[in-house]
Every structure is written in C-alpha cells, then in structure tokens.
Amino acid sequence: MAAAVQVRLHQASFSERALDAYRTHCAMCRLKHRELLDAAHIIPDSDPDGHPEVSNGLSLCKIHHAAFDRAIIGIRPDYVIEVREDVLREEDGPMLKYGLQALHNSELFLPSRTADRPSKDALERRYQSFLR
C-alpha cells in the first residue's frame, strides 16, 4: 500500500517535469496539445528501476503512449522509432498509415537539455522487451 501511495505522489511532479522537458510536444509526432499528452515511463514505475526521473520518461500523445506501452512501437537506444513488423504490414485507415506506420525509422523529438534526454540504458532495456 505504501508503495502505491508513493507512486501516486510523484506522478504529478514527474508528469509536469517530463512534459516541460519536451516543450509540451509528443516525442513521436510533435503534437502540441498538452491536454492530449501523457508522461510515459520508459521503465515502468512498477519496476524497482522505474524511477520518476525525466530521463526515464517521454512526453507522448495518448495514442503513442498506448502504442509504446503495448509494444506496438519501440524506441532504439539511438533514439530511432520502430513500428512492429506485423503493424507495418497491416492495411487500414489514415490513422494507422500516418499515425503509426509513418513513424517507422523516424527520430524521436528530444529535450534540449542533455540531462533530460531518455536514458540510453533504459531505452535499451525497453527495446529488448519490444523485440520479444
């Protein structure tokens, strides 16, 4: 119970700092509507290594946050976005084509401050789970 309370207490601060670091843009599609953005953890906060630090976070719009959490989209440690192979082969409407498939091999939008950029170690760990 104490861990759950601690997680909730840091969420607002983590979210604010992450969104500010990315200048209120989605790191994948550059959407700038704050009300449609989330602070996503690279290493989940339920993991002992999932610290509430900006370097363990990304500012993502709601669709890209969901796609990242469900391993539809992965991010390599060199900040390149990959879309899962089966999703790349799908045919559907414009949201799939332009909202997901078009991101494949594009570069992540990064914070200006080097210290706020995603941890390459955290990205590597998360990317390995994306590949499975």
Where are these regions (language model features)?
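Short amphipathic alpha-helical segments, especially helix-boundary/capping motifs
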Residues: 1-2, 34-37
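A detector for short metal-coordination/catalytic motifs
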Residues: 13, 31-34, 42-132
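Short, charged surface segments at domain edges that flank catalytic/cofactor-binding sites
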Residues: 1-25, 43-55
